[in-house]
Amino acid sequence: MNTENEFVIFELSNGLRVVHKQVNRPVAHCGLMINAGTRDELADEQGLAHFIEHAIFKGTKKRRSFHILNRLDSVGGEIDAYTTKENTCFYGTFLTEYYDRAIELISDITLNSIFPEAELEKEKEVVLDEINVYLDTPSDQIYDDFESQVFKNHPLGNAILGNVESVRSFTKTHLEKYIDRLYTAENMVFSSVGNVSASKLKVKLEKYFGAVKSGKAIQERNSFKSLPRNVVRIPKETFQTHCILGKAAFSPDQKKRLSLILLNNVLGGPAMNSILNLKVREKYGYTYNIESNYSVYTDSGLFSIYLASDPKYMNRCITAVQRELKNLRQKKMSSNKLSLAKQQLKGQLAISRESNNNIMLSYAKSLLVRNKIDSIETIHQKI
């Protein structure tokens, strides 16, 4: 076992990586993160990773759907899941005394799901309704439209939810083949934050996850190449006009990544004193919602600026954004402003660490993507 400040990292006998932080709290959090998401789907599988996230709760060899949902709910806990372009995660929150129950449940649904055909057909309707809700929300849909242009003809450009045709086509065989390709020990990380020792946790995990197939994922990911600049306008009957400007950005292993994280925070991060909020919303009143985002993928990244406004103000908004970007390029930030920006980011990171569930999920993703975890002190030093 390797101890790195506040957490412990170790491997199970089959190669499944584990990160654990022991805390003296009555509530614990744990989850299994799998390096399998939308970009790992084949041409006829669009939306399959997300559909599996739903279907995996519909029955195992020893439990029906109700018993899966009730297993942690009945003792005040909860189980949940989510899918991204590159990951699928199943995780739970519970009282410490139910650690064994939570681990066994996550193991059961990920290793022993039977995907009853009748349940799959019902769940298709749920997912199709989710797609319709998404299509009715232009502030969400525009992100899919944007990524489909930036990552054109690449799986990263596919929508996480898939489309109506693909979802309707899924069968039990589709689900089983995807899981067989990608749900392997070396393609997973188990993350835990709670009041249990690492040695006891390892015993539990060997018991419940020792049966996970060892080895790496069978499928290799396609690399991404940047495309030329492009402008796309999509007509839609809405009260507001929605806009995203952006491009492919740094991957996790590039040194400039932290600089872009800091720049993103200064430009359009969550704080009310971000440049775009002050200059476009507060100064001119052109928009209610304007923000910048930096998403990181295994071998690439995505930087974007989103805004929505009355159509008559959209050109003014875009001009104002371009002016602020030009100022950032041409005018060097003062030492004082840079110091304040760094302090703000450090404070935000520290506050995010107040949530043990956030810690559990961030540890899992870092170990899965980068195969290492930086302590908060190390991150502060790099900033």
Where are these regions (language model features)?
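N- or domain-start disorder-to-order transition segments that initiate the globular core
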Residues: 1-27
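Charge-rich, well-structured scaffold segments of protease-associated domains
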Residues: 11, 18, 65-224, 233, ...
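Active/ligand-binding-proximal structured segments within catalytic/core domains
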Residues: 15, 22-72, 146, 183, ...
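Flexible, small-/acidic-enriched active-site or ligand-binding loops
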Residues: 229-230
